[in-house]
Structures are given as C-alpha cells and as structure tokens.
Curated annotation (Swiss-Prot):
Residues 276-320, 563-591 form a coiled coil. Residues 580-590 have a biased composition (Acidic residues). Recruits rsa-1 and, thereby, phosphatase let-92/paa-1 complex to the centrosomes. Recruits sys-1/beta-catenin to mitotic centrosomes during the first embryonic cell divisions. Disruption phenotype: RNAi-mediated knockdown causes defects in spindle assembly characterized by kinetochore microtubule instability, a reduction in centrosomal microtubules and a decrease in outgrowth of microtubule plus ends from centrosomes. Also causes a reduction of sys-1/beta-catenin enrichment at centrosomes throughout early embryonic cleavages. Increases sys-1 nuclear accumulation without affecting sys-1 asymmetric distribution in E and MS blastomers. Its main location: cytoplasm. GO terms for biological process: embryonic digestive tract development; mitotic spindle organization; protein localization to organelle. Residues 20-148, 173-211, 407-453, 575-594, 600-662, 681-705 are annotated as: Disordered. This is Regulator of spindle assembly protein 2.
Length: 947
C-alpha cells in the first residue's frame, strides 16, 4: 500500500462526494477502496471466508486463537512426555533434577481450562491484578507474594524508628533523635556486590507477579540471570507505580503504629520522673488487672458450667437409649452404666480443676460418651430389626416384649411329702415334658450353642389327682383310684381371714418359689440369626433346654426322618407285592382276620400313637401294634419257627400287621397317609394349588405328572380386556371392573417412558442440585441411599405385580442424573454456580428425554426385567438336583425316587415354620394357664391339709 493519498481539490468537493458513505479510519487509494467495499458488502467472497474486523481499541482473542494456543500446548506436553519417557528408559543414571535439561517443574493447574470471555464469570479478585483506579487498594491480602515487595526501604525505616525509640528513651528530644538517626543511617553504607540496578529500579515484572507460580528447584542455580535484560521502560514505570502504591499503604499503617508507640513511651518517661503519678498509674493498672482476672474467671466458670451441663445431658440421653434397649430385650430391673453413674456423681466437683485440665478431662469424656452412644445406637438398630423381623415369633398377644416363661420350683416341704408316696402310674409320666416330639426315633441334633428357656417341668408328683393338660392318652383310672382310697381321708379346712400366721408364711414361701425368667420361647430357628449375635439374654445352664428338647426339625434330623419313612414305605411296598403273590395261600388267614372298617383303622392308629409316646423303647411301631392287639394277631403269633431273638420275631409278625395297617382305599394314594388333618385344617393339596396341582418338587418331566405349568401372565400382553378375559390364564389379581376402567391395556414400559419421565425428571434434577454435596463422587448404588426415587408402592397400590418395571426404571433414571452431575459439574469440591445449575438442568432434562424417553433406542432395562420374570416363573431353584443322576435309571429306581420325593414334600408341609409356630403358641398358652392353675391348687390343698 502506498502512502496515504492527499485529496486534490477543496474540502467542500470531497465532502459533497463522500457525504453519504460511512467514514473510514484509513483513507485508501481508489483501487484498494473498491476491494474493501466489496468485502464490506460481502460481494464475491469465497464460501468459507469471513470478513475479519480487528479493533485495536479492545482486542479480544477469538476461539481460533484459543484452539491454536491449546494445540500448541498439547504438542509441547507431548514432546515433554516423550523426553521424560526417553530419560526414564535410558541406561545412564539420572543427574540432579535441577541440572537436568529435561526437568520441567509441574505447573500448579493440571487441567487447562479454556478462558471464558464472559463478564459474569470474572473472579472478584481480578481487580487486585490490574488496579482500576490510581488510589491504593484498601485491603491488601497478606499473601506470600506480597512478601516480595518488602525490601531495603521498609527495613531501613524500621531500623530508623527503633533507633529513634532508643534515643528518646535515653532522654533526647524528638528533633535531636531524628537528626542523629538520619546522620547515622547515611553513614552506614553496606557494600552490595550482587545488586546491579539502581535503588529506584524495581525487580523485574516476572518475579513481581508471575502468571503461574513455578515450584522452585531445590538446588541453587549456578548462573544468576541479570534481571535487567528483559525489562523495558514501560515495565519499569508500571512496576514503580505498583510498588509506590504498596509502600504508601504500608508506610501509613507503620507510621501510625510507631507514632502511638512513641507517644506511650513519652508518657511513660514523664511518669517515671514523678513517683506519685507512677504510683497512681500502678494502682490503676493493678485494679484493671484484678477486674480483668475476675471477669476471665467468671467467663471460664460459665463455660465450665455449660460444658458440665452438656455432659450431664449426654449421659442422660445415653441412659435413656440403654433403658429403651433393655426394656425391649429383658424384664429384669434396669441398672444403668455404673461408670456413667460415678461420673454424674463426681462431675460437679470438676469446677475446681484449672481450665486446661478441665478442658482435657471433659473432652475425653465427650469422646467416650460419643463412642458409647454410637455403640448403643448400633445395638438398638439390631434389636429393632430383630423385633421387626420376629413379629410372627412373638408369644403372648403378639406384643413386642419378649414373653416370660414360668418356672415353678415346688417348695421343699412338698417335695418331702410327695417323695414318701408311691410312684405314679406310667400313664401319668408324660406330663414331665411340655411337648412330645412326634416320632420317638428321630433324635434331634444340636446345631447351635444358643438355647431357649422352656423349663422341663417335672410335675408328675404334684399332679396325681388331675389329668395333665398335655396328655394325649386317656388316663388309666384304676390304679389312681386305688391309691386315692388308700389315703386317709383328711377333713377339709376352709380358708378364712382368721387363718394362723404359719399359713400366710407358707403362701409367701410358695409365691417366692415361683420365679420368672425372661427368656424367649421360640421353638424355631430364626432366619435372621445374625442379628441376634450381640444381644445376650440372661440364662444359666440349669434353666435352659437343649435344642433336642424342642419341636423343630433341622436338616440332619429331617434327612434321617425321610430316610426312615422311605425305608418304612419300601417295606410296605414289598409286603403288598408278597401279599398279592400269596393271595391263594392267605385266603384262610383272611377268613380269620375280620374286615377292618375305616373307624377301626383310625382307632388302630390312635393306639399306635399312644403306645409310641408311652414307651421310649426302641421297638418298632409294628411290634407295639401286635402287642396291643394280641387277640387280632394271635393266629400268626404262634409260629413254629419262632426264636428268642426279637428282630426275627418282628420279621415273622410283619406280614399280618401290614394287612391290618393299610386301608384298601388308602393304597391308591400314598400321600394321604402323611397328612395329619386333625392338627392342621389345611391339607397338602390345597397348599400346593398355586403351582397348578403339580405335586412334584421338580420339573424333570417324568416324575409325578407332566402337566404343563400355566402360562405366566404379564403386563406386556397388551390384550384388550375382552380378549384377556377370554384367554385362559391364572386368576388375575385385579378384579374385572378395575381392569376395564383403570388398567385398560396399560403398558408399564410406555407409561414410564411417556408420562412418568415427564413428571419426575424436573423433580430429580432439583433433588440432584439440592443434594449436590452428598452426591459428590457417589456411584449409582449409593445414590439410592442419598435420595430414594419413588417406588411403585408409593405411587399406586393396586397393581402390585408391575413394581419391578416401574422401580427399576426410576432407579435407572435417577442413577443417570447422578452420573451426569458427577461427570460434568461437581468438580474440585466447590458448589455449583447459578449458571452451572441452569446448564445442568437443561442438559439433564435433554439427556433423560433422549436416552430414556419414548424415542430412545435403549430399552434394555425392560428386557432385563422380563427375563427375570421368566426365570422366576421357571423356578430354577426348585429343579431337582438329582435329575442328571436319575436320567439313566431303570423304572423301578425312578419309582423309588418318586416315593422319596413324596416324603420330602410331605415333611416340608408338616414341619413348615408357620405350622410349628402356631402349634407351639397354642401349647404354650394352654400349658401356661392349666399348669399354673393346677400347681397352685395342689400347693394350696397341701398347705391347707397340713394345717
């Protein structure tokens, strides 16, 4: 471009020509001017070309600049990494890092953030770097950087002031002191070899305000750079200005401080000259000191009182919590923590301790109490969980307090009296235990050291005149009558108010001998036994019953029972086969044995039960039946080959007995034999109905019956209500009316993605912003604890089989929100700004719509839930684990397995938790009432008859 042209002609003509045109900052020759105007009017520009306007007044870096800078930085970083890697892998040993040519100290910020050019995000402290006015800044932050500005000048000033101080104390006038100080300081000229600049020259701008503070190298550098090299005239001016601002600010403060000090020193010197004033001043000082001390002691005492009160409150809270736990697990009187009691008694005397000691002691106690409180809270949580889970196991009136077992020790006098009497008949002996186990052969194994406190009451001596409540057999009357008639008839004594004192004392001793023991009465091993580990119930050895005394069936004894049953059934089966084979021979026997009706069969089985419970011998039930019904089996019992060995006798007698036991109707269905309809109204068939009358415990397809399992109903069928009612499915949970109105073919997936997502998204985003501190660095699983997204139960209770779809979806989107806020917004441990909150809200809503909304391609969560539904329907846990073993077996063996399976199902039904608990509850209630009542009656009778 040539020189700026001077317009030929007058100014008026130029104005007339250029009046309408926009003014140009630079006057151009005509050939350049046209080109510029074309660009300005965006004529014949290339496609990607942009007109570039640069304003020198306020230059702003564009995005391209930043990108270029960023790229450059990345290249340098890469090169540095390469160098460092090469150095690391090289064989030569490393020199000291400072002298190492590859050593690059780490910058303070590890992450490069592209600078934002908006005014809003400017830091409030940016005014420190660039002074906005010529005034000195009001507050100067005390940073390590500001230490760099202290230099020889301020040091000199301080030295001069201290010198003046000394001179004035020694009695010079201020003027003299000043003169002398100036003179002395000008004489002291320190030799300065290193500093090469004049005193007005400030240090270079780089050391003044470094952009990125570098970590200083640990070793001293060999070469010292001359700092003048990089300074320019402008640098010097700016730095001088800054230093003047700093110094003027500091000097003002310093001078004021020094002047006040000098003033007080002058006053002090004057006071020293006149002793009366000095005395007064001293007196005043002492008074002020005394007042100050008094106030300090008072404030300290107030603080001590507050701390002591807080300690007392904490101890009180702790005691309350411990009392609550104690009441839940025990009925013993509560005695608090003895250490806390001692502390409460002695804590008021701590006021006398010096403050530091007091502080240490109370802090220790606070820590200790906090620790105890934490332990107590954990303990309480465990107890509460235990009680919440054991609702069904609680005894009387289903209160949450553990029930109380009655233990009755009969008085010593009664024992002496009854021991002299004759032993009771064997039929009465059964009252010694509270519950008889169903089968005498199965000895229970003890699986755990935990015991329960049902006391075995041996009341056989006391109950001679009464029937026991837990008897299963009608009492044999004759021997009892004989004994009663043998006793001398005592005249009945009436109880009256005028009874002698001895009677009352007897009553007292009798009542004292009834002691209550707080023990849980559960007869079933709990599913949540781990929660009980830290709760110890008070018990001693003699008060507890071993596991074998309870009616519960652990796995070992269940196996043994099933083995016994299968053995027994095998025998029955063999007998049936042999009987069919010998039908022709046994016709004569059938004539001898009367045809047994159903009634007689039931009485037989009753007798069998009686005999089993009465005799604890190891005889088999068949032998016992034979010995009971001697007349029935007399024909077969006189066998010529009979030997003296018992087991051989049993073998000979078995064929006839089996004929008696098996009922012809029952032979068809073996399962009926094991269901006890008297004990539990619910029969086995009813219990298994939901599985579609399929009795087998597996799906192996050749065992009991292979009727296909009913189709699982799902909410994804999308059938209209008419078609749905026509389809053959399980009974739907929702009634038909509700189905047509509320639930007309609603697809849960569609509902979640369309309606529910719209409603819940803003709520979730707000929650994430509110709880940002708790959500920082949290994964999706823990995020459910910070805020629980709504579950299906909260929203609607009617269709409870849809909850998996709904719940998994709400958890999914909440997790997505948490992940997003953690990934992009919660950085560096600071709170989000308003702008960031707005940005996050928009981004999160958009993300939820695109990724989880109706048009999103991702619906894996749905297929997952469907899959788990399917698996649940298949019941893979119930597939029989012996299936593979059994595949290659012959039919007879398969039949054997089928029998075993029947037994297993029956045992499971018979010894189900629920049944056992109900049974134990009933027995407990009746036993408690009847036994207590009878014992009291017999004791009162005995006491009265003695008198």
């Amino acid at each position: 471009m040539s020189k700026i042209p001077v317009f030929k002609g007058s100014f008026k003509s130029w104005l007339a020509k250029n009046d309408e045109k926009p003014a140009k900052s630079v006057l151009l020759e005509p050939k350049y001017r046209d080109h510029h105007e074309k660009i300005r009017n965006k004529e014949n520009m290339e496609e990607g070309e942009k007109p570039v306007f640069v304003s020198m007044a306020n230059p702003q870096p564009t995005r391209e600049d930043y990108e270029r800078y960023d790229e450059d930085r990345r290249l340098k970083d890469k090169a540095r990494d390469l160098r460092i890697a090469r150095r690391r892998n090289s064989a030569t040993p490393e020199a000291s890092p400072s002298s190492d040519q590859y050593f690059t100290p780490e910058p303070a910020d590890d992450e490069f953030v592209t600078p934002s050019t908006s005014k809003k995000s400017q830091k409030p402290r940016s005014s420190d770097a660039t002074p906005v006015s010529s005034k000195p800044p009001r507050y100067l932050p005390r940073t390590p950087l500001s230490e760099q500005y202290t230099s020889c000048l301020s040091r000199k000033m301080e030295e001069n002031f201290s010198r003046m101080q000394e001179l004035m104390i020694s009695g010079h006038s201020p003027h003299e002191a000043r003169q002398q100080t100036i003179q002395e300081s000008s004489e002291q000229l320190e030799p300065r070899a290193k500093v090469t600049r004049s005193s007005s020259q400030p240090p270079p701008i780089d050391t003044l305000k470094p952009r990125v503070p570098r970590i200083e190298s640990p070793l001293v550098k060999k070469t010292t750079e001359t700092p003048i090299r990089r300074t320019s005239y402008v640098d010097t001016l700016v730095a001088t200005h800054q230093i003047q601002l700093q110094y003027s600010d500091r000097v003002v403060v310093g001078v004021e401080r020094q002047m006040t000090k000098l003033e007080s020193i002058k006053n002090l010197a004057a006071a020293n000259r006149s002793p009366i004033i000095a005395e007064e001043a001293k007196k005043r000082r002492n008074e002020a000191e005394a007042v100050r001390k008094l106030i300090e002691v008072e404030t300290q005492n107030a603080k001590k009182r507050a701390v002591i009160q807080e300690l007392k409150d904490r101890i009180d809270k702790l005691t309350q919590a411990q009392l609550a736990i104690h009441q839940l697990v025990s009925s013993q009187p509560f005695s608090g923590d003895p250490y806390n009691q001692r502390l409460l008694r002695s804590i008021d005397n701590w006021m006398a301790l010096p403050f530091r000691e007091f502080d240490i002691q109370t802090a220790r106690e606070m820590l200790e109490l906090a620790r105890k409180m934490k332990i107590t809270i954990d303990h309480f949580r465990n107890v509460a969980t235990l009680h919440r889970n054991s609702k069904s196991l609680n005894r009387s009136l289903n209160t949450s307090r553990k029930s109380i077992a009655v233990k009755i020790n009969p008085s010593s006098q009664l024992n002496q009296q009854s021991s002299s009497d004759a032993a009771p008949p064997p039929s009465m002996r059964e009252a010694s235990t509270q519950m008889t186990s169903r089968l005498a052969e199965s000895a229970m194994t003890q699986t755990s050291p935990r015991r329960i406190g049902v006391e075995p009451l041996d009341l056989s001596q006391l109950l001679e005149k009464h029937n026991s409540s837990s008897q299963t057999t009608p009492p044999v009357v004759e021997p009892v009558l004989a004994e009663v008639s043998a006793e001398p008839q005592r005249p009945p004594v009436t109880l009256s108010m005028t009874a002698p004192v001895s009677t009352i004392a007897e009553f007292d001793s009798m009542l004292n001998s009834i002691s209550l023991h707080n023990e849980s009465l559960e007869t079933v091993a709990e599913p949540f036994s781990r929660l009980k580990t830290d709760i110890s119930f008070p018990s001693t050895v003699e008060e507890t019953t071993p596991r074998s005394g309870r009616v519960s069936l652990d796995s070992e004894s269940a196996r043994r029972l099933s083995a016994g049953l299968s053995h027994y059934l095998e025998q029955v089966k063999k007998e049936r086969e042999s009987m069919e084979a010998q039908e022709s021979e046994s016709e004569s026997m059938e004539l001898e044995i009367p045809v047994v009706s159903e009634v007689s069969v039931t009485t037989e089985s009753e007798n069998l039960e009686e005999v089993v419970s009465e005799h604890s011998d190891s005889k088999s039930p068949e032998t016992l039946v034979a010995s009971d019904n001697g007349e029935d089996s007399s024909g077969g019992s006189e066998d010529p080959n009979a030997t003296q060995f018992e087991h051989e006798i049993e073998e000979h007698k078995e064929p006839e007995k089996l004929g008696l036991i098996i009922d012809p109707e029952d032979e068809q269905d073996e399962t009926k034999r094991f269901v006890n309809h008297d004990e539990f109204e619910q029969s086995l068939e009813e219990e298994l109905e939901p599985r579609g009358n399929n009795d087998s415990a597996d799906d192996s397809g050749f065992l009991l019956d292979n009727s296909p399992a009913p189709r699982l109903k799902s909410i994804f069928d999308n059938l209209p209500p008419a078609a749905a009612s026509a389809a053959v499915t399980d009974t739907p949970r929702v009634p038909a009316e509700a189905d047509e109105t509320t639930f007309a073919g609603m697809d849960m997936e569609e509902y979640c993605q369309r309606e529910f997502l719209k409603e819940i998204s803003p709520i979730m985003v707000q929650k994430a912003i509110e709880l940002q501190d708790e959500l920082r660095g949290v994964d999706w699983l823990t995020a459910q604890d910070v805020w629980q997204p709504p579950s299906f139960k909260d929203v609607q209770m009617e269709f409870d089989d849809n909850f998996e779809y709904f719940d998994s979806f709400s958890i999914l989107i909440w997790s997505a929100v948490v992940d997003l806020i953690n990934k992009n917004y919660l950085k560096f441990g600071r709170k989000m700004t308003e702008n960031e909150e707005i940005a996050f809200e928009a981004e999160a809503l958009k993300m939820l719509q695109t990724e989880h909304g109706p048009e999103s391609r991702k619906s894996e969560w749905c297929t997952d839930v469907k899959m788990s539904k399917k698996l649940e329907g298949m019941m893979p846990m119930e597939l029989d684990y012996r299936y593979d073993v059994r595949r290659g077996l012959p039919d007879a063996e398969k039949q054997k397995y089928q029998w075993q399976q029947v037994q297993m199902t029956v045992i499971a039904a018979r010894y189900a938790n629920k049944n056992l608990i109900n049974e134990a509850n009933e027995v407990y209630a009746t036993e408690k009432e009847k036994l207590g009542q009878m014992v009291l009656e017999s004791e009162i009778d005995a006491t009265v008859t003695d008198v």
